[in-house]
Amino acid sequence: MTGEDSISTLGLILGVGLLLLLVSILGYSLAKWYQRGYCWEGPNFVFNLYQIRNLKDLEMGPPFTISGHISSTDGGYMKFSNGLV
């Protein structure tokens, strides 16, 4: 009985070790494959200040910020930034 328990424990340890080795080799090869550019075009996670040049109207504020009003004479929307100061 004790011999069978030690064999199953040793098999479990070897199995987990081989599984971890296989997963690490697979992860390393996928990382190298991605760095070489064989994968799809990955997103750019680096924040670049030059990317916000093309944003014309960028208003930073909470969702309840009032940024304009509806003119009753024209019936259209007018931003506060377009009004007279």
Curated annotation (Swiss-Prot):
It comes from Homo sapiens (Human). It comes from the Eukaryota. It is found in: Membrane. The gene is SMIM35. Keywords: Membrane, Transmembrane, Transmembrane helix. This is Small integral membrane protein 35. GO terms for cellular component: membrane. It is a single-pass membrane protein. The chain crosses the membrane at residues 7-27.
